[in-house]
Amino acid sequence: MIAIDFEYNNNRLVCVCCKKSDTIYKFWLADNSDTDAFKKFVNDNKNEIFCCHALEKAEGQAFQRMDLDPTDYKWYDTYTVESIKTKATNLVFRENSLFEALSLVALEQKYLNKTSDETSDRSKHKHEMRDIIIADKELDEHKTEILDYCAEDIDSLEQIAIQQCKDYAELVEKYKAVKTFNLKLENFQKYTSYEQWMTIFVNLCHAVAIYSKCAYKGLNINDKALKIIAKKDVILENLKRAFNDKFKTDAFVFEQVVIKGRGKTKSAVTVNLHGKKDSKILDYLASQAESEIQKIHNDFIWPKSDSGKFKLDKETLKSYCICDTEFAKDLSEIETFRSGLAAVENFDKTLITHPCHHMFGAQTGRCTPKPTDGFLPCMGQLFRSFMNPRDNEHLLVSIDYSAQETAIAAAWGKDKNMLWCYQQPDFYVAAGYKFGVIDDMHATKKTHPRERDKCKLLCLTSNYGQGYKATAKLLNISEEESKDLIKKYTDTFSGYSDKRKRLLYNCSKSLVPTVLLTDDGMPYVYIPEDSAKNCKDKDDVQHIHKFFHCKSKFFCKPSTSLGNAPIQSAGATMLRYIINRLNEENIDLVCSMHDEVILNLPKESWKEQADRAIQIMTDAFKNLYGQDAYIHVGEPEVAEFNGVLIPHSDRVIPRFKKLIEFGVFSENDVKIE
């Protein structure tokens, strides 16, 4: 293994240090004097594993600046591995104080038993050196000092990597419980070697190297459109006018607020009505609707979440909002549009934003960036129209699965009824027919909208293991009706439901922590609630504390997260397969999200490359569930750039028309064909 670390002066490479065995190699890159020597060094050691911290943002970018393809090398990224492990505490632990930083200094304290004083001194020294490195001075004056500082980081990288892998090996060795999500017992002795875990994580980090290439190329953004939406005051004024006109009042005053949370900043639209400040638009609508409906139905209560807040998803608004349905949907779209502006403000001034793929921020490896993280493609289809191809010779092509999670659930559970419903034009209508909620075999979304919505919510909540009480609140029905509906679901989709129950039973009743493996070997650590509550062995408690590097009396995972883990982990496995194959075939990946890839394809040959990508996506599913397994890949959505804003699909055109109506854009700004 070779530990490697770069130092930057803003976007300029300053130096790199490498440690192989006990020898440290230092290369000065600020004046390119050692660039060729470094390139020769890495190429001479191509068979070694390069160990780094934050591959996508640092080493991957640096390699490409020197015309080195990061996917030609084997990587171990301590940041990615720790992210998978510690982000899992979101489901394991209940207190924010248990979350640990993922910086290299924090990892040194965790894995190398550094004291608080040592960590504090180290952090102070790093800040002092960073001030020297990024200062607008001649770096050659501090060359020796900077190189020595760079070498300090690599001294601990290899030790951290080995200890990360040993943690998994020791957990398996102690509890001897390794299974796949299909409940097949694995040879646990194979996984008591830290070298085996090293191999698993090196394979994982190959996908991170591919993503570093996406980040290096960046994402082109429509400059003109950004300047338009930057005029927030104009948008708020027009939103206020449209809303007041709708309710024939002038009482509404709209404000843009910024909410700062743990590591995140998001933007929200609030309404100040009759002196009541910070009331969200949709909360106001729900409260108003509840009062009006209670005049007719005394016992009506607007559906609420477990925390007691109004449910404000589109389906609930559509069902109960007293203003017309389309306006409720419009408000929801405007709310999403406005909340995205905080992220837009964080875009790079060059109008190129590097897509930060957080797909490894969950133990399943399946995690998508949120709109407030500044990841444009996740801001809904409306915001996707702000993306441009890399140049006028290319097109942006978006390809995704149709109801991927349903197809995975049907294949995983070998559920014939679920597969039949999936193969119909509308899964939820077909499911409603199977449940007996819809009596017309030829029903459609338009003919039975309410019944379909009920079946959709039932399927989604049941897939995530929601109980009858929560389902009753969500659907606004009695608990007895909820029990009956859930029984219809489990009886109809018995293949999937029974498989899920077996997984929950086998893991939660095992009374010991279990390492579940995804189809490509990724670990998912499950600690049953009973084992945590009944654990009297202090050594067991300490061992689990050590694994997660935190202290807590409780370290159990809810069964709902475990029940959905096979679906999410399979989706992550498929995505890793897809991006690896796209990279092998030189198909230009711009970014990926959940079950979708966005490609930058040549105008002349985009259809051929899109067809190849569709075949790769189909192969990813069949590799998991056999050649007879069925999944549908949607038709590609194509977008080009000709200087104005062009909606990418028919589904967002009505939203742009509404934005024009609300005064966000003029008809000259948007081309709607």
Regions found by a protein language model. Give the residues of each.
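Acidic, glycine-rich two-metal-ion catalytic cores of nucleic acid-processing enzymes
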Residues: I4, N9-R12, C17-D22, F252-K446, ...
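Active-site-proximal helix-loop-helix substrate-binding element of RNase H-like nuclease domains
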Residues: N11-V14, D22-S33, E48-Y168, K179, ...
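Short, conserved charged micro-motifs
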Residues: D36, E604-R612
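Mixed-charge, glycine-rich, non-catalytic linkers/tails in nucleic-acid processing enzymes
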Residues: S123-F252, G413-Y422, D426
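Catalytic palm active-site di-aspartate
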Residues: D153-I154, E158, A209-G218, A225, ...
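Extended, well-ordered alpha-helical scaffold/bundle regions in very large, multi-domain proteins
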Residues: T192, W197-D324, T461-L504
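Conserved catalytic core of nucleic-acid polymerases
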Residues: A209-Y216, V437-D588, S592, E635-E673
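A common structural junction motif
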Residues: F493, Q615-Y625
